[in-house]
Amino acid sequence: MSSKKKKADAEVSQTQATVEVRADVDVEELEGIGRVTGAKLKERGYYTVRDIAFASVKELAEIIGNEDRAQQIIEAARKMLGLHSFISALEVYERRKKIRRISTGVRSLDELLGGGIETRAVTEIVGEFGSGKTQLCHQLAVMVQLPEERGGLGAKAIYIDTENTFRPERIMQIAKARGLDSDQALHNIFYARAYSSDHQMILVEQAKSIIKQHNVALLVVDSVIAHFRSEFPGRENLAERQQKLNKHVADLLRLADAYDVAVVITNQVMAQPDVFFGNPLRPAGGNILAHGATYRLWLRKSKENIRIAKIFDSPYHPEGEVSFRITEEGLVD
């Protein structure tokens, strides 16, 4: 390695270390934020400079009551974290090398995904009822707890359940098969049932404080679309639904990036009655989810306990598919 390359790598590493330290600085340390304003921000889930840097002007203005001041505070936070200017593609590459991955526990699926489920990204799992979406989410909530040498991150998970499909008994089965203490595996999962789309969005906001206080590396929302579809039926409500869903997905993307966690969401499918050739099913949520998710994985049933996983949208993965089995021990090749 040349001396120039070593120097460049050292500079990038030093910059990243400095940014990480500054990111966790208390919000009240920012210029323009006093104790009263700081208390208001913390009440709404903005605890650190990192939280402010990833906020929108509109969100902050609603809290502090002044749009210009909100803009100034956000700019100050982004400047502190080095987010206010361009960086070299080399630095982007070096940052990408530090991305962490959670093994799915299925070797072929990990290979399809380039090593597993990425942090700082939203991975969407699409499929019909019974295709294995929730099973995969359960397995990931266990896999993240394994040490890095076994494909995990030695971390905890947050699980937001919108359809009452979370089963602790299944977690215990998968954990036991992976050599983990089943009770401890359950203890390492923060669970919440979401009863409406509003409640679902509030839980994502509350997840920030849990991530800050605990070693959390995975956030699951299963399913992301269910409440939005039931609460906003018909074409007359579509625009309102999509606007609200857009904010929810944007919040998830910001959370993934700001806290270096893997966000996994499941999505339902819907039929296209005017399609006579090819697959008549398409993911629910329209362009909002299509553009919001970083990676999109489609699961479908095959014979007996076999499922097919296809990656159909990714910034850099080629399209491809693999098969896996659902067993009592979990998902396996």
UniProtKB/Swiss-Prot annotation:
Listed under GO biological process in this entry are: DNA recombination; DNA repair
Any Pfam family matching the protein: HHH_5
Explain the purpose of this protein. Answer: Involved in DNA repair and in homologous recombination. Binds and assemble on single-stranded DNA to form a nucleoprotein filament. Hydrolyzes ATP in a ssDNA-dependent manner and promotes DNA strand exchange between homologous DNA molecules.
Query: What organism does the record attribute this protein to?
Result: Pyrobaculum aerophilum (strain ATCC 51768 / DSM 7523 / JCM 9630 / CIP 104966 / NBRC 100827 / IM2)
Parts forming coiled coils: none
- What keywords is this UniProt entry annotated with? ATP-binding, DNA damage, DNA recombination, DNA-binding, Nucleotide-binding
Spell out the family assignment given in the record's similarity comment.
Answer: Belongs to the eukaryotic RecA-like protein family.
Q: Which domain of life is it from?
A: Archaea
Q: Does the keyword Cell inner membrane apply?
A: no
Q: Which PROSITE patterns does this one have? A: RECA_2, RECA_3
GO MF terms held by the record: ATP binding; ATP hydrolysis activity; ATP-dependent DNA damage sensor activity; damaged DNA binding
Name by which UniProt lists this protein: DNA repair and recombination protein RadA
* Residues bound to ATP: G127, E128, F129, G130, S131, G132, K133, T134
Q: Which InterPro entries match?
A: AAA+_ATPase (IPR003593), DNA_recomb/repair_Rad51_C (IPR013632), DNA_recomb/repair_RadA (IPR011938), DNA_recomb/repair_RecA-like (IPR016467), DNA_repair_Rad51/TF_NusA_a-hlx (IPR010995), P-loop_NTPase (IPR027417), RecA_ATP-bd (IPR020588), RecA_monomer-monomer_interface (IPR020587)
Q: Which SMART domains match?
A: AAA
User: Which NCBIfam families does UniProt cross-reference here?
Assistant: PRK04301.1 (NF003301), recomb_radA (TIGR02236)
